[in-house]
């Protein structure tokens, strides 16, 4: 599987399986399990998708060692501030049933992105997240 090396040295698969618009838990779990069985190693979910629990169950059921998977989720705008990001991360981790996250993204450039980013940096430095980033931001919103 092809990977790209992020600035911090983390290897990320270049192809992933996203679960946007799969709200039914049983369906989501089934398709994620099948995606992992067919070779996908990057699974992309988000707090806003409402399916982190199903993704977590699929990860546990798939029979692939956790360290071979790359799991991404995203912070939604309703929690886009320092404290909200910390609490939402803890909730996502509980729903996913993971000890660490490979990539945590700010989902949209709305709200207190600076405060949320500070929280992500702290979680990264605590070893709870391997990499952090942004999603749906334009270049001038990150410069």
Can you say where each PLM-predicted feature lies in the sequence?
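N-terminal binding-site loop/beta-alpha segment at the start of enzyme catalytic domains
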Residues: 1-69
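Short, functionally important structural connectors and interaction interfaces within domains
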Residues: 2-7, 14, 72, 88, ...
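Hydrophobic faces of well-ordered beta-strands that scaffold small-molecule active sites
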Residues: 13-18, 43, 69-73, 101-106, ...
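Glycine/proline-rich, positively charged
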Residues: 23, 80-143
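N-terminal, well-ordered alpha-helical segments
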Residues: 33, 53-57, 73, 87-90, ...
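Basic side chains
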Residues: 41, 66, 74, 95, ...
């Amino acid at each position: 599987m092809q990977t790209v090396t992020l600035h911090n040295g983390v290897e990320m698969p270049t192809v992933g399986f996203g679960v946007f618009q799969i709200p039914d838990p049983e369906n989501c779990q089934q398709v994620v399990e099948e995606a992992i069985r067919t070779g996908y190693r990057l699974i992309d979910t988000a707090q806003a998708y409402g399916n982190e629990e199903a993704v977590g169950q699929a990860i546990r059921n798939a029979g692939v060692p956790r360290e071979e998977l790359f799991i991404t989720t995203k912070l939604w705008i309703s929690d886009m501030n320092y404290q909200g990001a910390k609490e939402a991360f803890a909730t996502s981790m509980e729903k996913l049933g993971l000890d660490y996250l490979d990539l945590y993204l700010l989902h949209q450039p709305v709200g207190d992105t600076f405060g949320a980013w500070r929280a992500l940096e702290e979680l990264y430095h605590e070893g709870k997240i391997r990499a952090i980033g942004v999603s749906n931001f334009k270049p001038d919103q990150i410069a």
